[in-house]
């Protein structure tokens, strides 16, 4: 069994120890499906899905069932009617981590696996990008240079959205963000209708504060972790690759980067990383890591080989 050398609220696993906890959980994901879920530059393969994500899906499945029993016990204490089994209280998962660390891929793979379980087939994934203030508002507040930092989000709207989902509303609407336009799409909405599980993915979703925060409504928190130096290199590599993908679109906000040669592209990416993404990671994102129920630690090759689970 995995052990820590001194008392701790966490238990740590290497990949071999963790994969043993899969038990008989079946792999219900094909290579073709995985290709569609894999982010640019990500190296995840079916073996990692089997050894890392299936045990995680099993753990969450068990916690969903336990959480519903807890809600039922509270309802009994209050003398309230038992909840409709077709409309359980949604189980909310937060997925946090730096830009370029692979948290979006983690969230998509987890969504695909959890939706395969008969007991919770309705799994919605929402990113916090939609809750960024529109560029016009960021300009008005002089925050364009702080885009992605906590103050650039409409945290009240995000809180209302998650509260609405968690409280069992018939539907809740999230704004939609366009990475192509680098802005909120006016009038576009992502409609969520009483899911069994909601996955909320974003840089700062585990953030705490002096008042009620969205992380206080989470049932499970995941932090995707790696060495800062490795994340920087992944960011630069992704930036270079995007010159021939997203940046190549004439409609892209970043189309002017598409024609840069390697030397200039690396310099541009490094400047963005060191002036924006690294400070945000160090000041705001990394300090939320202890809030996670599970930390997935990546090596330089993107593979997850160490995990830390909060047991208390």
Swiss-Prot record:
EC number(s) stated in the UniProt entry for this protein: 2.7.1.33
Pathway(s) where this gene product acts: Cofactor biosynthesis; coenzyme A biosynthesis; CoA from (R)-pantothenate: step 1/5
GO MF entries: ATP binding; pantothenate kinase activity
Keywords annotated in UniProt: ATP-binding, Coenzyme A biosynthesis, Cytoplasm, Kinase, Nucleotide-binding, Transferase
CC annotations in GO: cytoplasm
Pfam families: PRK (PF00485)
Coiled coil: none
Matches recorded under CDD domains: PanK
List of residues binding ATP: 97-104
Top-level taxon in the UniProt lineage: Bacteria
Catalysed reaction, written as an equation: (R)-pantothenate + ATP = (R)-4'-phosphopantothenate + ADP + H(+)
Signal sequence, start to end: none
UniProt record, GO biological process: coenzyme A biosynthetic process
NCBIfam families named among the record's database cross-references: panK_bact (TIGR00554)
Similarity comment: family membership: Belongs to the prokaryotic pantothenate kinase family.
Protein name, UniProt field: Pantothenate kinase
Record organism: Mycolicibacterium paratuberculosis (strain ATCC BAA-968 / K-10) (Mycobacterium paratuberculosis)
Gene: coaA
